[in-house]
Amino acid sequence: MRLILCLPVLVVVLLMVLEGPAPAQGAPAIASTFRNIPNSLKEFGNNLKDAFESIPEATQKLMTSFAEGLKNFRIPMV
């Protein structure tokens, strides 16, 4: 019974393997790629700048919440 159930799966896998690799997608024109590099670098720089500018604020929030947690921390008496 298992053989009857496995045969269709094996046939599908065999057909997929024999089909071969998918054809490559057409590459965009190299000139348009070079034209987009400055914009991509500028966007990356802006994202990096925003990320670094948010570090002090996030650190301050973390330290504040940590200090609040320490204020409320009590060692249980046994």
Curated annotation (Swiss-Prot):
PANTHER family: APOLIPOPROTEIN C-I (PTHR16565:SF2). It is found in: Secreted. This is Apolipoprotein C-I. Residues 1-26 form the signal peptide. Inhibitor of lipoprotein binding to the low density lipoprotein (LDL) receptor, LDL receptor-related protein, and very low density lipoprotein (VLDL) receptor. Associates with high density lipoproteins (HDL) and the triacylglycerol-rich lipoproteins in the plasma and makes up about 10% of the protein of the VLDL and 2% of that of HDL. Appears to interfere directly with fatty acid uptake and is also the major plasma inhibitor of cholesteryl ester transfer protein (CETP). Binds free fatty acids and reduces their intracellular esterification. One of its GO terms (biological process) is lipid transport. The keyword Signal applies. Disulfide bonds: none annotated. Its main location: secreted. It comes from Acinonyx jubatus. Belongs to the apolipoprotein C1 family. GO terms for molecular function: fatty acid binding; phospholipase inhibitor activity. The gene is APOC1. GO terms for cellular component: high-density lipoprotein particle; very-low-density lipoprotein particle. Keywords: Lipid transport, Secreted, Signal, Transport, VLDL.
